[in-house]
A protein has these predicted regions:
Chain A
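Conserved, mostly hydrophobic/aromatic
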Residues: 3, 30, 34, 42, ...
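Hydrophobic faces of well-ordered beta-strands that scaffold small-molecule active sites
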Residues: 3-7, 38-40, 69-71, 99-103, ...
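Active-site mouth loops of central-metabolism enzymes
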Residues: 7-20, 74-82, 165-175, 269-279
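Acidic (Asp/Glu)-rich catalytic clusters
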Residues: 31-32, 57-66, 88, 92-98, ...
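N-terminal small/glycine-rich loop or linker at the start of catalytic domains
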Residues: 1-14, 108-111, 150-165, 258-271
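An alpha-helical appendage that flanks or caps ligand/catalytic pockets
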Residues: 120-158, 199-296, 328-332
């Protein structure tokens, strides 16, 4: 079982320079503390510092030894798969074979306008680009490709190649069943975002495995990971109280909480499955994901809502030193 | 005979509504974008018992058609096949996720009034103010103290009654509102109803505080 963290670099009141420096330091700590994965997402909004995660991952690669360098997610619909492959192949070479991509459609839509894409095309954009990226990752030789969403490629050599024989490309799924079908048909590992109760995602995992079997993929090549918001405190009540103001602010981005997330709703989310609590509570919730969904990796969004770096560091330390060793032991 | 239900949209919301409709004993058809094999697998896992069909076929054979597609793709809904059916708008407009859609920007009417005008058929607004996880988790038998309420807003009394019966059979207390535009208070960002998962008494008192009276006819 692999354990890791992910971030969008929520700005809070911090300067971009400070947030990026904190992230690199936190990734370095995660590496030293033995966590398996650091994943960076991208949002193209002023309340987040990360729109170019591959650059930050490159900085992290220079100060870490073992930790895998991933994304959460790469908004592939509005990117060029050729360029994405080149960037992560370069990161893979720089890092000694630690790069990965989690390709997804993203939660927000700003990147469509910024990069000149039509939101109504989001389905075909993601589908075509994912297939092209997988082709680039899986096939060594020149690539010929035709599609609607970018210029054709004719015997194109895309260089450099990744250091790993096949650069891992996961498909990120937010709950849309068609996305699980796609991941299975393509035989790609699937990352599922889960914030409260993991039980409804059982259907997505079943769809994923059945779609993969129907397409003839070897079940041994399939993997499921999950991840969501996470805060670990010394005590159950302390964790809830400390994290609430930041989470309530963060979730005011959701339509149902546009006036702020009520404490009762927050407590209900924690009861249903949100990973906020003591180390033991977080251990139990990750093990529940494993039992229900068969995950072999969990990544927690560890710096939600512009918390002060001290709070983030403390939660991260508890995750790395008190949660991760127990989950590894229980899942071994 | 039970009303036949068609759900247009096999995403997060549509698959839950189809599952609830099957559980309520209604003959249920479901349509989605993309290829039929993918839809068949999705329905088999998430809404077994529902029959995958094309949108036009599903709508044509149904009494109640629930539209649950992304608003940005409303033009994929077979409007002609909706004529003469009770049509339910389960959708919401929320620009951070949908993108900015000119038809719904600066809309003072309910988004369902715009859906009605674009589809060219009468619609009833319901299911929109509870999340799909919650719709799945909160079904309760009639009389259960924990039962949650779903508002049902529309202009046509018979259509509102038909949808209210379905809501009740699915496991929620229906609260009828008239006219359709009254459903504006059910939308994201406009009141304390959206995403609040209220009981019938709580929904009624919230509506009262907003100055919205429920429609008299209650099944």
């Amino acid at each position: 079982m692999e354990l890791g963290i992910y971030s969008f670099g929520d700005s809070g009141t911090h300067s971009t320079r400070q947030r990026l420096a904190d992230l690199v330091a936190q990734a370095r700590y995660a590496d030293e503390a033995g966590l398996d994965v650091i994943a960076l997402g991208e949002h193209h909004r002023p309340d987040f510092t990360l729109s170019a995660p591959e650059l930050v991952l490159a900085a992290i690669s220079a100060v870490t030894e073992r930790i895998r360098l991933s994304t959460a997610v790469t908004v592939l619909s509005t990117a060029d798969p050729v360029r994405v492959y080149q960037q992560f192949a370069t990161l893979d070479q720089l890092s000694g074979g630690r790069a990965e991509i989690v390709a997804g459609r993203g939660a927000f839509t700003e990147s469509f306008g910024l990069f000149g894409y039509d939101l109504r095309e989001y389905e075909v954009l993601f589908d075509e680009k994912l297939r092209l990226l997988l082709t680039l990752a899986r096939e060594e030789g020149p690539v010929t490709w035709r599609g609607r969403t970018r210029e054709p490629l004719d015997d194109a050599l895309v260089t450099p190649r990744a250091l790993q024989p096949v650069l891992p490309v996961w498909v990120g799924v937010g709950g849309t069943p068609q996305s699980a079908v796609r991941a299975g048909r393509l035989g790609a590992p699937m990352f599922v975002a889960i914030f409260t109760d993991p039980a409804p995602a059982r259907g997505l995992v079943e769809i994923y495995h059945r779609a993969a079997a129907n397409a003839g993929h070897d079940p041994a090549g399939l993997r499921v990971a999950s991840g969501g918001h996470m805060y670990v405190g010394h005590t159950s009540q302390g964790a809830r109280d400390e994290f609430y103001p930041y989470y309530a602010e963060y979730l005011s981005k959701l339509p149902q909480f546009s006036g702020g997330m009520p404490r009762a709703a927050y407590d209900e989310w924690i009861r249903a499955g949100l990973l906020v609590g003591s180390p033991q509570e977080v251990i139990d919730k990750i093990m529940n994901h494993r039992e229900l969904l068969g995950i072999s990796r969990y990544v927690g969004q560890f710096d939600v809502g512009g918390m002060p770096a001290g709070m983030v560091d403390k939660s991260l330390e508890l995750f790395a030193t008190e949660v991760a060793p127990v989950v590894r032991k229980e899942s071994a | 005979m039970s009303a036949r239900v068609a759900v247009l949209g096999a995403g997060k919301v549509g698959t839950v509504l189809a599952r609830l409709s099957v559980a309520a004993g209604r003959p249920t058809a479901i349509a989605g974008s993309g290829d039929p094999a993918a839809l068949g697998l999705i329905v088999d896992v998430l809404a077994p018992g529902a029959v995958p069909m094309t949108g036009a076929d599903a709508a044509a054979q149904a009494d109640i058609v629930i539209v649950a597609v992304p608003l940005a793709r409303l033009e994929t809904v077979p409007a002609a096949a909706l004529k003469g059916r009770v049509v339910v708008d389960a959708m919401n407009y929320w620009p951070p996720v949908d993108g900015v859609l000119p038809a719904w920007e600066d809309a003072t009417p309910s988004s369902s009034e715009i859906v009605r005008d674009l589809l060219g058929v009468d619609v009833v607004k319901s299911f929109n103010h509870m999340g799909y996880h919650e719709l799945d988790a909160w079904t309760r038998p009639a009389g259960d103290l924990d039962r949650r309420a779903l508002a049902v807003a529309g202009d046509d009394g018979a259509a509102v009654t038909a949808v209210a019966e379905l809501v009740d059979a699915m496991g929620f207390d229906p609260v009828p509102l008239r006219p359709l535009g009254a459903g504006r208070v059910l939308q994201p960002g406009s009141s304390d109803i959206f995403g609040a998962d209220l009981t019938r008494a709580e929904l009624l008192s919230t509506l009262d505080a907003l100055g919205v009276a429920p429609a008299a006819a209650c099944p």
